[in-house]
Amino acid sequence: MNTLPNYEIYCVKYGERPGRRPEHFVGGDPHDESMPMDYFVWLVRNAERTVLVDTGYTAKMAIRGRVLLRTPAEGLALIGTRASEIRDVIITHLHNDHVGTFYDFPNARFHLQDKEMEYVTGRHMLHNIFRRPYEIDEVTAMIRKVYENRVVFYNGEGEVAPGISVHHIGGHTMGLQSVRVHTARGWVVLASDASHYYEHFEKNRCFPLVYHLGDMLEGFAALRRLADSEQHIVPGHDPLVLQRYPAASAELRGIVARLDLPPVALFIEAVVCQPVPAR
């Protein structure tokens, strides 16, 4: 019997921006409270293989109210991985905060959904509401990668490597994909923008930048099917991720978290909330 390999998963924060609750939900939110957004890339690795999920935004894009704390390549260096070593990059979608520094990975192939390439080169880009989060230079650069035989396309779901698979979700964009990774604690799903925050999939609420609202809602159910539990679903932009999961090291607390390890905060909450036995 073939045993699937286990991987470590590192969530690397490279940027952030302030925000308010009403801007993160369709229909707004009655509580006008602070709700900042973090920006991550994710490194999946074991002794045999290293795969990067997304490449973040560029310094040019940071001027749009965002803060660039470090480039994704600099973030990876903090955990001992050089950008030049990476051979496979999964692009969950082509928004500018997920594909921006692709050029820092000169030896990589890029794994992308057919529908995302169809979306960014087709009629929907005639509408500013869909076009706005994309950068034409990044889209055309990915087309060039196709002509260089450096793009691997998927139609729905597919295996990138044993224990690592991509799954078309849609909703946020036509071709959004999430990533399923086998770890020592089970199947972890990197939702990316299928769920920006925990609150989106936990309460079936939608982020307002959306291609298809129905697909986004159905996507929450897909995430649950793919993951071993809701505690195995990792949202794409929630600052709580770095609080709920153990840091890669004491020095990297608040910068890099280990998603292949059990969520510390949830464990603590569960212990604290246990009923006190009667005496």
Regions found by a protein language model. Give the residues of each.
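Core dinuclear metal-dependent hydrolase active-site scaffold
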Residues: C11, V41-R45, V51, N155-A184
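Metallo-beta-lactamase
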Residues: R70, G75-T81, E85, K115-H168, ...
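Histidine-centered catalytic micro-motifs
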Residues: V89-V99, I169-L176, V234-L240
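Active-site metal-binding motif and surrounding structural segment of the metallo-beta-lactamase
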Residues: R66-L112
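Short glycine-enriched, charge-decorated loop/helix-capping segments at active-site entrances
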Residues: V26-P30, K60-A62, R66, L126-I129, ...
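Active-site metal-binding loops of divalent metal-dependent hydrolases
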Residues: Y14-G15, T55-T58, L94, K115-E116, ...
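Cap/insert and terminal regions of metallo-dependent hydrolase folds
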Residues: E74, S178, A184-R279
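Zn-dependent metallo-beta-lactamase
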Residues: M1-V51, Y57-A59, A222, A247, ...
